[in-house]
């Protein structure tokens, strides 16, 4: 969501979002007392965010695992303290403890989804210090437990300081859908907006919520407003539906046209909060027998798997570099990116919207072939010890819910994927794998009925034990696309990975197992929706360069 208060009578407490990326102090290791305001960090390195423990980063399987501390000083005025103060993180791998002026503001576990903390009670006039203790230590009850990647620590995505009125729209607190679009074949639709309005005061507050839909040129197409009340220290959930909008410009990879919902909260005639949410009018259908359709048009997508890391930077990639990756893939002829194998940054989804790239967004439930006993990211994807099961499932569900809340308004996203190759689990853990996948699918349907829940990397087991039909879409990696069980499987399906063989060898060329003959894709297999090559770019791997291509 973009945010701005302007153009009307705005209260001095109206929302301001401040880039908080510059002038941090960093030191690798764990240090007693580093959360204190008087801690001496004069010999620490000065860094900017995004930042990674692994900078400089190249294709080595070895990386630092442990703790790192970040500290930053910032000034606040008496006017600032009249507002609610929040610090927002887009991603910290993998555990973060946040302190403000020596007081713990909160902790978050999960390396690929954003979070925020209210720091109002800890802040004071003058100089303030925020300190963040980060670790990337493998844990048996935190997702992911395994994966063919490099799990670098750090505050590797953007940070913001956000000042808000005590009555405000919650973090990613709007959900925009277009429920009539498919039935009307793209000619018209209402816009439904669900909004969470928070009240941090100790009294009931009456407010007005004005919701406007604007086109790309800023023209207001429709609006709806409601007067509501929100009880003290609580959140009010509102649902508004506009009049139908005609003559729509549909979002498509060839013409990624975006509209905006502008949500404004008033007390009396005074604007106290405003949030802008870009969205697109588009509808899609995954079918079991005819493939994938976008805006009523059959589309056999040519997809590509993309990790978030880049040479030198590791996972600490700038927004411009993310966009460059998307543009390179688009130039190469791809029209879908599978976000391998975890939620990517909000800026990545935004760039997919703006540049016209379909996006398959994946939760971090991930396995790796040849898994070993617990202790590192080559362990069983699902816990082998019963005592870890409950916390691990809670971790996977938490990160799935955060992924959906953060990314749900992006028109580029056409599927939520629950996992990648979760079958790389100990035999005794497979019952738990199925149970967790079912829970994740059910949660996805509850949180976002407008998109399907996919099972990525579902090419094993075969026969009666298969997992691909637990969700709405089956994704098959490697040889899974050729297995008899997955030919015309009776559900929407994709080849979620193929290729990946790279070699330099003397003699005549001989095809590898991943080579595919150039063809029109869907001809002969009309039930297949598309395919995604492994992979778009070289990436870091715990197995080293032999698997990082």
Residue ranges of each PLM-predicted region?
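Aromatic-lined substrate-binding rim segments of carbohydrate-active enzymes
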Residues: 326-378, 388, 434-447
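Accessory carbohydrate-binding/adhesion or oligomerization-edge regions at the termini
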Residues: 6-57, 61, 75, 129, ...
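Beta-strand-rich binding/interaction modules
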Residues: 100, 187-229, 239
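N-terminal carbohydrate-binding accessory modules
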Residues: 14-15, 22, 31, 173-176, ...
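Aromatic- and acidic-residue-enriched carbohydrate-binding clefts of CAZyme catalytic domains
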Residues: 302-307, 362-391, 397-404, 408, ...
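Substrate-binding clefts and catalytic carboxylate motifs of secreted carbohydrate-active enzymes
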Residues: 16-35, 48, 54, 151-154, ...
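Surface beta-strand/loop "capping" patches
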Residues: 166-202
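Accessory beta-strand-rich segments of carbohydrate-active enzymes
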Residues: 18-20, 30, 65-171, 200-201, ...
């Amino acid at each position: 969501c973009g945010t701005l208060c302007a153009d009307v009578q705005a209260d001095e407490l109206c929302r301001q979002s401040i880039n908080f990326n510059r002038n941090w102090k960093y030191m690798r290791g764990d240090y007693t007392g580093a959360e204190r305001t008087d801690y001496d960090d004069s010999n620490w390195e000065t860094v900017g965010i995004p930042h990674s423990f692994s900078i400089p980063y190249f294709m080595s399987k070895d990386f630092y695992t442990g703790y790192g501390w970040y500290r930053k000083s910032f000034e606040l005025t008496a006017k600032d303290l009249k507002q609610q103060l929040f610090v927002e993180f887009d991603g910290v791998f993998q555990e973060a403890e946040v302190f403000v002026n020596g007081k713990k503001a909160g902790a978050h576990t999960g390396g690929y989804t954003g979070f925020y903390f209210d720091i109002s009670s800890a802040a004071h006039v003058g100089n303030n210090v925020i300190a963040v203790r980060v670790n990337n230590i493998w844990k048996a009850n935190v997702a992911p437990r395994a994966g063919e990647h490099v799990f670098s620590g750090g505050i590797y995505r953007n940070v913001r300081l956000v000042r808000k009125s005590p009555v405000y729209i919650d973090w990613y607190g709007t959900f925009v859908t277009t429920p009539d679009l498919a039935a009307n074949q793209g000619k018209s639709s209402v816009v439904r907006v669900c909004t969470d309005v928070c009240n941090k005061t100790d009294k009931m507050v009456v407010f007005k919520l004005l919701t406007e839909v604007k086109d790309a040129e800023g023209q207001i197409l429709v609006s709806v407003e409601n007067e509501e009340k929100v009880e003290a220290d609580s959140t009010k959930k509102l649902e508004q539906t506009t009049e139908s909008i005609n003559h729509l410009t549909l979002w498509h990879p060839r013409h990624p046209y975006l509209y905006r919902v502008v949500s404004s909260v008033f007390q009396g005639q005074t604007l106290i909060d405003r949030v802008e949410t870009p969205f697109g009018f588009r509808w899609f259908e995954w079918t079991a027998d005819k493939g994938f359709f976008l805006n009523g048009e059959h589309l056999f997508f040519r997809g590509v798997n993309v990790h978030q890391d880049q040479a030198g930077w590791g996972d600490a990639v700038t927004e411009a570099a993310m966009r460059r990756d998307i543009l390179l893939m688009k130039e190469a002829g791809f029209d879908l990116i599978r976000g391998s194998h975890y939620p990517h940054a909000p800026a990545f989804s935004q760039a997919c919207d703006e540049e016209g790239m379909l996006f398959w967004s994946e939760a971090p439930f991930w396995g790796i072939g040849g898994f070993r006993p617990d202790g590192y990211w080559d362990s069983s994807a699902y816990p082998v010890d019963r005592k870890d099961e409950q916390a691990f499932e809670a971790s996977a569900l938490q990160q799935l819910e955060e992924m959906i809340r953060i990314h749900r308004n992006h028109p580029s996203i056409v599927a939520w994927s629950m996992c990648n190759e979760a079958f790389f689990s100990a035999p005794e853990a497979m019952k738990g794998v199925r149970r967790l996948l079912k829970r994740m699918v059910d949660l996805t349907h509850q949180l976002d009925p407008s998109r399907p829940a996919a099972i990525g990397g579902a090419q094993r087991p075969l026969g009666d034990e298969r997992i691909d039909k637990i969700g709405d879409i089956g994704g098959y990696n490697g040889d899974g696309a050729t297995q008899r069980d997955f030919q015309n499987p009776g559900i929407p399906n994709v080849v979620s990975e193929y290729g990946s063989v790279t070699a330099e060898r003397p003699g005549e060329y001989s095809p590898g197992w991943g080579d595919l003959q150039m063809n029109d894709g869907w001809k002969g297999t009309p039930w297949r929706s598309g395919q995604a090559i492994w992979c778009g770019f070289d990436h870091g791997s715990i197995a080293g360069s032999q698997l990082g291509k």
